[in-house]
Amino acid sequence: MTQGKQPDGVARTSYKDTLNLLQTSFGMRANASQREPELQEFWKQQGIDLELGLNNQGQNFTLHDGPPYANGALHMGHALNKVLKDIINKHQILRGRQVRFVPGWDCHGLPIELKVLQNLNQEQREALTPLKLRKKAAAFARKQVDSQMAGFRRWGIWADWEHPYLTLQKEYEAAQIQVFGKMFQKGYIYRGLKPVHWSPSSRTALAEAELEYPDGHTSPSVYVAFPAAKLPEKLRTSLGNQGLELPNNGLELGQALQIAIWTTTPWTLPANLAVSVNEKLDYSFAVDNQGRLLLVAAELLPSLRDTLALELTARATVKGALLAGLIYKHPLLDRDSPIVIGGEYITTESGTGLVHTAPGHGVDDFNTGQKHDLGMLCPVDESGTMTSEAGPFAGLNVLKDANPTIIAALEERGALLKHEPYAHRYPYDWRTKKPTIFRATEQWFASVEGFRNEALTAINSVEWLPASGRNRMEAMVRERGDWCISRQRTWGVPIPVFYEREGNEVLLNDETLAHVKALITEHGADVWWERNEVELLPPAYAAEAERWRKGTDTMDVWFDSGSSWAAVASQQEGLAYPTELYLEGSDQHRGWFQSSLLTSVAINSQAPYRQVLTHGFALDEKGRKMSKSLGNVVDPAVIIDGGKNQKQEPPYGADVLRLWVSSVDYSADVPIGASILRQIADVYRKVRNTSRYLLGNLHDFDPERDAIPVPELPLLDRWMLQRTAEVMDEISTAFDRYEFYRFFQLLQSYCVVDLSNFYLDIAKDRLYVSSPSERRRRSCQTAMALIIERLAGAISPVLCHMAEDIWQNLPYSVAEDSVFRRGWPTVPETWRDPSMMAPMHQLRELRSAVNRVLEDCRSQGELGAALEAAVRLEAHSEALQEALDWLRQQGDPDVDGLRDWLLVSHLQVGGEPWAELLASQDNALATIEVARARGSKCERCWHYETDVGQHTTHPTLCGRCVGVLEHQ
């Protein structure tokens, strides 16, 4: 087969103006820095970004916003969280549900207090009263809220921005006081002296949620020998029966027998009041190579021989129960203390099996101390400095010089068996990044024990996404202790309690609570610092106001945010309680999810949410946590607006940021970085270019005038609508299940594989070359108009700006002024024809196989465009033959020709094999032969036809193109 050249001497005419080329104002580039704010202003002016959700007639959908902390610049964690919420809200609005998203901010707490103090010099600090500090903190928080709000809005987040909730608002603070009051009335609030997590660096108690456990912490681990002073008779008898006789004299007994303990907090040894054992364990009296007996758990003897480098041989073994009542001497202080029975926390996993017990410095120690009436000793002040109760160690700091000093003293007394560093998880203050301690103080607690079972029941009523969240929350609530809710800080909601000035009585009752709540409702929590006891107490107590002093503690910030269901969701118009959904990072199982659950269950015996969805953390491309020191911080503002070097950090716009959020499996930690952003931007461009192609080919199309009924469309168009229906169904399911990565995958495949590479690739000829109003062109435009409207709707929860831009650039009129007023895209049943799926699958497989052979020819320089080729096919599979018959019998002759679908100039199915071949391939599907197409290239449609040159008016055109021009 040969290809002819154009006749010599023929003047070439440009036929570009006779083609139906793209016409659209929808840009190839997004110009996001200008266009996105314009679209956001359009939504605002048209009442789309708020009123649309408020005015919907469907069921209420409340996604309650977990308040971010009002401090610092927005980061990728904010972006992941807020965009996920916005995608869900926009989808629900499109589904016709009533949505009012109220954004919130957590405004109290130490970080803001510290920020205020950092900006003051020493003189200003000294002049700072608590009330002045609060005023400055409130101003700082509000400024941070304004800054963060502007960032959220730039991301295209829809919310009731004019009415956010801030935990510093007086109505919020009053609702929080009411939550506290109701819990108090139910007996769930109490004051007690208990060991709590204490931060010497912040000088306040901390809740579990305010702790972090950084890698790399080591503590000084010591094995210590406590000399025995007196044995209970039952124990002495049991030892005698085993042939072990011990001295009666206390001094001699102490030299002969010593109790071995292990601790990683040597600084707590001055507070030791007992040694605890497990009554069920076996304990050995083991002689070492110095002739001394050490009391240790029998099971640990082999490991202790290695650890202590001692020859330890058991002389006698008894159950732990027999050790109760053994008296020992403190190795550093003049104090005798007993061995007592502890609990199941005493194991043989580490240490010696005997536990140094300081009730003032540990929860298990405290509980054991309560059980055995050991008393309380906590010789450490709020800064971590040892008090006079620590004897010779007074003045030492427990996190600095106390440990080495005490270890040296133990060694000097001969009581130190071993000293080595020990790496383990240790709690740090999440704000100051410094170690915490356990310290017994008078604090206010919420008695979780009082409603633990109800909380566990409530957890089971919630749908947790992912499902593992249920087990995580159950374990935390089942194992947690009572909640320490008091803080020794100024910037917060006051614990509304009065203390007797001369005695120990506490004044807190329904009357005082109601009075304080009324004052805060009117004036805000500052009133607690602005007024004296005469005004803060109810009138009935005014006469004895001098007897009382107001408390200075504030509430844990987790109690603040944990009251949001009461202050916001259950109070404000357009919201619902229990809410449909809470959505935050996975760290909130021990934070906001839990504090909200506890307060809601305590008061109303139900969870505040029906669903809880968690996401992971944003990491760099190597899976590392972002930090300034590593230089791997990805700034969402730079993603949107670009960096200093815009070639290296181009301005991608908010939609690319949003598309990234949709692309990740957020149930785990998610990576983000320059190369990932380039990939996401590439997908964005493909979706945009596909949309632009659809819009550009509709410039002369009016659906009312030009559309063809769907049942009358050619097979190719009907299949494309059937495929669109499938994709829309799958996208709807993905959104319903919050599986946005499935949306991302479906969108990419639909735009690239189904539309660009197949349907639109085939459609170019009939779109460009046909007469403008020709049926083969109008049928394609009909399908394209139906597709672009649904594509715009389907992407609108994620690519909200692009979707609206598409809608504003539709070249024909539609009833709705915004894509969001159209609602969630649906497809008529006339689009659905599952019988097309099997034959179309075969034909697409055939097209892919032919393209591979053509590509091989191109790579070898034997072919340029596919239209230079002629192809002969021979079907091998029955399924393909049936598909070819189906296409031939049911296809539209002007559109559904296999030659046009393969984009070649000539096609032969069956018949004799060709002689002059460029390539030939046999596979299970078919025999594919490729040769050069006969004829010459038409200057207008680029097909190779044998009739080119036969038309004197247009000597470089094929007969088809001549016919089109003559018709025009």
Curated annotation (Swiss-Prot):
Name its co-factor(s).
Answer: Zn(2+)
Q: How is the cofactor bound?
A: Binds 1 zinc ion per subunit.
Q: Which residues bind ATP?
A: 628
Q: Where is this motif: 'KMSKS' region?
A: 625-629
Q: Which UniProt keywords apply?
A: Aminoacyl-tRNA synthetase, ATP-binding, Cytoplasm, Ligase, Metal-binding, Nucleotide-binding, Protein biosynthesis, Zinc
What EC number(s) are associated with this protein in UniProt? 6.1.1.5
Q: Which residues bind Zn(2+)?
A: 938, 941, 958, 961
Motif 'HIGH' region mapped to chain = 68-78
Class of the enzyme per the UniProt entry, highest EC level? ligase
Question: One GO MF term, please?
Answer: zinc ion binding
Kindly list the biological process annotations in GO that this record carries. isoleucyl-tRNA aminoacylation
The residues listed in the UniProt record as binding L-isoleucyl-5'-AMP, with positions renumbered to this chain, are 584
PROSITE patterns found in the cross-reference section: AA_TRNA_LIGASE_I
Q: Which Gene3D superfamilies match?
A: 1.10.730.20, HUPs (3.40.50.620), Ile-tRNA synthetase CP2 domain-like (1.10.10.830), Valyl/Leucyl/Isoleucyl-tRNA synthetase, editing domain (3.90.740.10)
Which InterPro entries did the record assign? aa-tRNA-synth_I_CS, aa-tRNA-synth_Ia, Anticodon_Ile_BEm, Ile-tRNA-ligase, Ile-tRNA-ligase_type1, Ile-tRNA_ligase, M/V/L/I-tRNA-synth_anticd-bd, Rossmann-like_a/b/a_fold
Assembly and interaction partners: Monomer.
Q: What is known of its domains?
A: IleRS has two distinct active sites: one for aminoacylation and one for editing. The misactivated valine is translocated from the active site to the editing site, which sterically excludes the correctly activated isoleucine. The single editing site contains two valyl binding pockets, one specific for each substrate (Val-AMP or Val-tRNA(Ile)).
Biological role: Catalyzes the attachment of isoleucine to tRNA(Ile). As IleRS can inadvertently accommodate and process structurally similar amino acids such as valine, to avoid such errors it has two additional distinct tRNA(Ile)-dependent editing activities. One activity is designated as 'pretransfer' editing and involves the hydrolysis of activated Val-AMP. The other activity is designated 'posttransfer' editing and involves deacylation of mischarged Val-tRNA(Ile).
Question: Matching NCBIfam families, A to Z?
Answer: ileS
Would you tell me the protein name for this molecule?
Answer: Isoleucine--tRNA ligase
